[in-house]
Amino acid sequence: MNPVIELLLQRRSVRAYEDRTLVQEAKDQILEATLRAPTAGNLMLYSIVEISDQRSKDDLARLCDNQPFIACAPWVVLFAADYQRWHDLFAWSGVEETCRQAGEAMRNPEVGDLLLACADALIAAQTAVIAAESLGIGSCYIGDIMENCERTRDLLGLTPYVFPICLLCFGYPDARQAGKERSSRFERKFICFENKYRRLIRRAGRDDRGTPTRVIQGPQVDRWCRQPGAARL
C-alpha cells in the first residue's frame, strides 16, 4: 500500500502524550508544510497562533468543555479564519478612500467571506495534522474552541474579522495509545454519492442511516440537541 494512504488510514486522535517536548525543527517542518496547503485564490485566509503560555493553555482547557489534556499537550495551536489581514490591507491601500470618491461604501467581510476563510483554515489545519503524523507526532482536534469564541477572542487578542475555527493539540503518543482501536466510520455508501445528493432517510427509512459511530449521551446531550439542525436528524 502507498505509505501516504497507509498513514491516512491509520491516523487517529491522540489525547495522551509522552512527557517529551517537540523540538523546534519538527514544528518548523510542520508549519512549512502547512503553509503549502491549498487556499482559495492564494489568499491564505487564516492565521496560526501557537499557544506556549501555560496559563493560556489552562484557560483554553476550561473554555473547551473542561478537557485537561489540552493543558498538558506539548504543542497547542489555534487555526483561525482570518479576513482581518486583507481588510486591513484594503484600508491601508486606500480602497476606502477610492470607494468614498465613487460614492460607495467599502464592503466589509460578510458570511460568505467567513465561510471561505473557515475552509482555508481547516484545510491548513488538516495539512498540519498529516505533516505531524508523518513525523510520528499525534494530534487531536478541539472543535469546542468555537463554543466560547467571545472569551477566546479576549484571551488570544482576536480582532473582529478573525474567528477561532479549531484548536489542535500535538504530541508524541504515550504507551496507552499503542493498543487503542481506531474509531469506526460510516460505510462509504452512506457518505459518497454520484452526480446528485441522496437523502437516505427518505429513500429507505431510518435504518438506512447505518449504525452511528458513537452514542451521544451524558451532560452534553441537551446542549447538542439545541444545535441547529439537530432536531431534524
Model-derived segments and their meaning:
Residues M1-L233:
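Acidic, surface-exposed loops and disordered segments
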